[in-house]
């Protein structure tokens, strides 16, 4: 009799994805982030569901309902901080996952990569709308500033903004719809993750060498299930340490003040994981130009397969390209720092320089370095 794992219509799908999946024998810990992101997504959905049971999406009670969750609900503080810091964890893992993809040339798996970019945009939209829900000062003003950027779109911009707001300012209608979208999007993300995996399993995973690994595959279970479990333990340790010791480390103190449309905070800024894009947005004095730069700073990921001119897939054996990638990582760190600083000298100039360097490295230096490495290797 055939094993039920291999014959049952539903169980065999899980079997082909997580148990008997042929995986390259040499994938490193950098390949753990996909499964970690899956666990993170499940954690966010579960904690979010419990928060939604006690939250009220109304401007007059939203802030106090979050306070009620933290003070009166059993372990409500834990659920709330797991959800808030889980989002930070999510983005740390996403950025490492993308960095891995760039370093090892995983973007050559075009469908998987493009679905991943769409996923990134969806996750960013979800996180942004989630940040609006507690209805603190930074929630309100962040929503006002970011939604207002759409008014830069020629002709339809102003109407589009009012349509999204559901009125002439960020108000009750905006909060209600943001809650509705924030609730539904994680399930859409889950469906997209399945498509992401479907395309990945069509081609098989990349590996650190960037070479074809069809001649040397091993089953996913037990080798990589145990390896992923170690990753889960590290993630759980990091997240619980953050939640139990410094839950507000990554938050903004302004969000502990209820939203007040008559009082603007001195420095409006998004959560830390958006600061690099926010710095790029602010570095351009023109509104439409800033919005385009903001969108393109993330959309640029789609161009990576076209900008890949090296004869080698991975950067493992390309020290010059490796240096460039680490300079890019340092540059993104500088942009993140600048995004959280006030708009004054010298931060304006540093932000503009870092923004130019960001695009210059990706669009010009990386392709030319690849060509130079080809020449050096006489390829």
UniProtKB/Swiss-Prot annotation:
Residue ranges of the TM segments: 33-53, 77-98, 113-133, 178-198, 226-246, 288-308, 320-340, 347-367
Any one GO CC term of the record: mitochondrial inner membrane
Obligatory cofactor(s): heme b
Function noted in UniProt: Component of the ubiquinol-cytochrome c reductase complex (complex III or cytochrome b-c1 complex) that is part of the mitochondrial respiratory chain. The b-c1 complex mediates electron transfer from ubiquinol to cytochrome c. Contributes to the generation of a proton gradient across the mitochondrial membrane that is then used for ATP synthesis.
Miscellaneous comment text of the record: Heme 1 (or BL or b562) is low-potential and absorbs at about 562 nm, and heme 2 (or BH or b566) is high-potential and absorbs at about 566 nm.
PANTHER family: CYTOCHROME B
Protein name: Cytochrome b
């Amino acid at each position: 009799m055939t094993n039920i794992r291999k014959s049952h219509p539903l169980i065999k799908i899980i079997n082909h994805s997580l148990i008997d999946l042929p995986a390259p024998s040499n994938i490193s810990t950098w390949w753990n982030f996909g499964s970690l992101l899956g666990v993170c997504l499940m954690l966010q959905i579960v904690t979010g569901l419990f928060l939604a049971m006690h939250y009220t999406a109304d401007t007059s009670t939203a802030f106090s309902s979050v306070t009620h969750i933290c003070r009166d609900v059993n372990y409500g503080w834990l659920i709330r901080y797991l959800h808030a810091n889980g989002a930070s964890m999510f983005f740390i893992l996403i950025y490492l996952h993308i960095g891995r993809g760039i370093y090892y040339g995983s973007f050559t798996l075009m469908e998987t990569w493009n679905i991943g970019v769409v996923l990134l945009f969806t996750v960013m939209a979800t996180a942004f709308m989630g940040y609006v829900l507690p209805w603190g000062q930074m929630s309100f003003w962040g929503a006002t500033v970011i939604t207002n950027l759409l008014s830069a779109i020629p002709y339809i911009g102003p109407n589009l903004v009012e349509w999204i707001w559901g009125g002439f300012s960020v108000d009750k209608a905006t909060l209600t719809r943001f809650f509705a979208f924030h609730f539904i999007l994680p399930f859409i993300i889950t469906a997209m993750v399945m498509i992401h995996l479907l395309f990945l399993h069509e081609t098989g995973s990349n590996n650190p060498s960037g070479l074809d690994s069809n001649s040397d595959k091993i089953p996913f279970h037990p080798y990589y299930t145990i390896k992923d479990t170690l990753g889960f333990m590290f993630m759980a340790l990091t997240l619980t340490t953050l939640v139990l010791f410094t839950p507000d480390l990554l938050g903004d103190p302004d969000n502990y003040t209820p939203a007040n449309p008559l009082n603007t905070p001195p420095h409006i800024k998004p959560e830390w994981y958006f600061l690099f894009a926010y710095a790029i947005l602010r570095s351009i004095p023109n509104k439409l130009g800033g919005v385009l730069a903001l969108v393109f700073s993330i959309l640029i990921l789609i161009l990576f397969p076209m900008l890949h001119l090296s004869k080698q897939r991975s950067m493992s054996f390309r020290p010059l390209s490796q240096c460039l990638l680490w300079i890019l990582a340092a540059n993104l760190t500088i942009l993140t720092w600048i995004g959280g600083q006030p708009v004054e000298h010298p931060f304006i100039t540093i932000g503009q320089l870092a923004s130019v360097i960001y695009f210059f490295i990706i669009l010009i230096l990386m392709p030319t370095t690849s060509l130079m490495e080809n020449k050096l290797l006489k390829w």
